[in-house]
């Protein structure tokens, strides 16, 4: 008789920065799904606004960082000393639907191998309901695949108008080194993507402890954005699989923790895209990443932040190339 698959234990890590109420909502959604041997850790990235006190009043285990060193460093801090078998990440502006944790853990019931996946990425849906945006509407979300969308108000959503849209079914990388969410803004009822995917989305995912520790966790110098793309590259370079688990559903308030049109987002995203391409991609992809950035600088309205990101990436390129050469020589 076939033995039932044992459910691995999990440590869930949520990173907070000055968003205590959002973080509490996320924690409540996942806390009720925890089993024996599981843990939930909230890392506060030096919010300095009373967040830690509010989180502790909720009964949450809070680890305080002495300074805000970014998302990746926050996750690494929350995973320190981990004894649980699987690390689960949930953005503080996301909500895990019932069955989310069980589905992710079922996909990672065995240690990573050529057959068993090392990591699993969830089905992340955008919160609310959406309709096609009117021409020129400034606050629309844009997808080259499905067009421009705007969020309906709560009353229209309650009437069932509009569409539920996908935020991510995993991470992909294009020919210019751009990491992006698979199925971004695809209506959920039309999403039927395969389980095999290049990488994970750090907003709602899980990774086996063996893989996490072997890779040393997230890169901390990226601060925020592209940590998941970089980690996905490193998983692939080890020959480890990442799979998409449709049954693990989270709903995400897109960009409620950091605006995607802010100068900071554009600068950091530009820098990290180029540095991640330099760290992992073939030379033509790195050149494409640089060329794309130059074109965006000349044509786009965000010249200042793009130029700043390009300058920071250029300063970091020698370090990335040195690391890459050193890694290649040590593997021979």
Describe each PLM feature range.
Residues 87:
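Short aromatic/hydrophobic "clamp" motif used to bind/position activated sugar donors
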Residues 285-332:
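Non-catalytic, C-terminal membrane-associated alpha-helical segments of glycosyltransferases
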Residues 99-167, 171-178:
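Conserved donor NDP-sugar-binding/catalytic core segment of glycosyltransferases
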Residues 50, 72, 94-107:
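Acidic donor-binding/catalytic loop of UDP-sugar-dependent glycosyltransferases
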Residues 196-249:
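A short, conserved alpha-helix in the catalytic core of glycosyltransferases
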Residues 29, 44-52, 67, 97:
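A conserved acidic beta->alpha catalytic loop
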Residues 65-82, 92-94, 170:
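Glycine-rich, basic loop-to-helix element that forms the pyrophosphate-binding segment
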Residues 28-37:
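Short, acidic, metal-binding catalytic loop of nucleotide-sugar glycosyltransferases
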């Amino acid at each position: 008789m076939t033995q039932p698959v044992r459910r691995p234990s999990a440590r869930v890590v949520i990173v907070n920065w000055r968003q205590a109420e959002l973080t509490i909502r996320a924690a409540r959604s996942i806390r009720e799904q925890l089993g024996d041997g599981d843990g939930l850790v909230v890392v506060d990235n030096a919010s300095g606004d009373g967040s830690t006190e509010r989180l502790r009043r909720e009964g949450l285990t809070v680890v305080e960082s002495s300074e805000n060193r970014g998302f990746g460093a926050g996750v690494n801090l929350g995973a320190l000393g981990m004894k649980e078998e699987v690390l689960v990440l949930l953005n503080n502006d996301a909500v895990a639907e019932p069955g989310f944790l069980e589905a992710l853990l079922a996909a990672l019931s065995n240690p990573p191998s050529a057959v068993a996946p090392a990591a699993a990425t969830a089905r992340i849906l955008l919160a609310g309901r959406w309709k096609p945006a009117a021409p020129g509407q400034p606050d629309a979300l844009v997808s080259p695949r499905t067009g421009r969308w705007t969020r309906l108000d709560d009353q229209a959503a309650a009437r069932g108008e509009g569409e539920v849209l996908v935020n991510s079914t995993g991470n992909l990388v294009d020919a210019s080194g751009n990491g992006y969410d698979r199925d971004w803004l695809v209506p959920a009822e039309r999403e039927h993507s395969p389980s095999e995917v290049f990488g994970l989305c750090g907003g709602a995912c899980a990774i086996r402890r063996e893989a996490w520790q072997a890779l040393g966790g997230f890169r901390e110098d990226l601060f925020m954005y592209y940590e998941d793309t970089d980690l996905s590259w490193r998983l692939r370079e080890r020959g480890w699989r990442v799979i998409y688990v449709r049954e693990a559903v989270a709903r995400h308030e897109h960009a409620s923790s950091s605006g995607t049109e802010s100068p900071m987002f554009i600068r950091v995203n530009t820098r990290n895209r180029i540095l991640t391409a330099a760290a992992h991609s073939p030379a033509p992809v790195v050149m494409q990443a640089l060329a794309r950035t130059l074109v965006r600088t000349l044509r786009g309205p965000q010249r200042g932040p793009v130029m700043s990101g390009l300058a920071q990436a250029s300063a970091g390129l020698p370090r990335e190339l040195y690391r890459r050469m050193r890694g290649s020589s040590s593997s021979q």
